[in-house]
Amino acid sequence: MSDGSRTALSKSTFHFAAGLGSGVLSAVLLQPIDLLKTRVQQSGAHSLSAAIADIRAAPRLLPALWRGAVPSALRTGFGSAIYFTSLNAIRQSAARISPLPSSSSSTTTSSSTTTSSSSSSLPKLSNTSNLLAGAAARSLAGLILMPLTVLKVRYESTLYNYTSLASAARDIAAHEGARGFFAGYGATAVRDAPYAGLYVLFYEQGKKRLSQLFPTTTTTTTTNSTQNGPMGLQHAASINFASGVLAGVICSVVSNPFDAVKTRIQLQPGRYRNMVSGARRMVGEEGVRALWDGLALRMSRKAVSSALAWTVYEELIRRAEAGWRAGAARERL
């Protein structure tokens, strides 16, 4: 294997590890909110206050709040790992095929200076490329992790009395077959692909705009010209986190109807067979409001979890990129 191949492999492995770590962290911290969202969405008559009352009535409060944390951490952790790895590969390829004009015109600025004045070391793409890359990467990750998603939702719900993940898996396999592990994938893909695509688009635009609104301190060079100084850890993390929250709020509002239908399909596949018929049934029996059940919970969780995952991931990659550049510089000496 050539040095270039080994370097590419190590970078892909690090993207996978960074995505895994950021996903697990956000999933575990925010599991109580996700649990409440599932309880609210499982039935049109289930309100937030009723869901909280059910959990408070449990013999042990903390285990009740973190019920389903293991499948959630596995799904979100490996989902983030697959997503960030595939997204990076797609964006790197897109950047080589169709680079932004600004990236090729900056001939007098070194690459290290360009990276240091930005809150991110990830490839810079057009809005369309960011949209398509995010959608494609999320669709792939969603398909691979769908069985864990079904197990997580069933385990969190009060409609099933599963005592363990193994018993849940055996029950689904016995009564629904392999198809049961992919219940709701259509609604999930329709929800997640646009969400992820729009998220990457708004996230990148947010970083760009916020970096302009809150620039780094300027420094004076030996030629008496001024330029942006290196962006520090706290400044970059603040911009990335704020951009992530804003993108998460916008995308959660747009995609919540698909999430509400998806949850019903996964919990009651016999009653809600697909996205179209499920949406019609929910609206016909409960009104349009049913499509917005759990919006506040989902919006708060998705905004914070996505922002946290992206901020941690970006910082790990920034540090790794700095190490890789330093190593490459030493090899050239």
Curated annotation (Swiss-Prot):
Principal subcellular localization: mitochondrion
Compartment list: Mitochondrion inner membrane
Annotated region (Disordered), positions in chain: 98-126
Membrane-topology descriptor: Multi-pass membrane protein
Catalytic activities: glycine(in) = glycine(out)
UniProt-recorded Gene Ontology molecular function terms: glycine transmembrane transporter activity
Record's keyword annotation contains Transmembrane: yes
GO biological process, one term: glycine import into mitochondrion
A GO term from the CC aspect: mitochondrial inner membrane
Placement of Solcar repeats on the sequence: 10-93, 125-209, 235-319
HAMAP family (alphabetical): SLC25A38
Name of the molecule in the record: Mitochondrial glycine transporter
Organism name: Chaetomium globosum (strain ATCC 6205 / CBS 148.51 / DSM 1962 / NBRC 6347 / NRRL 1970)
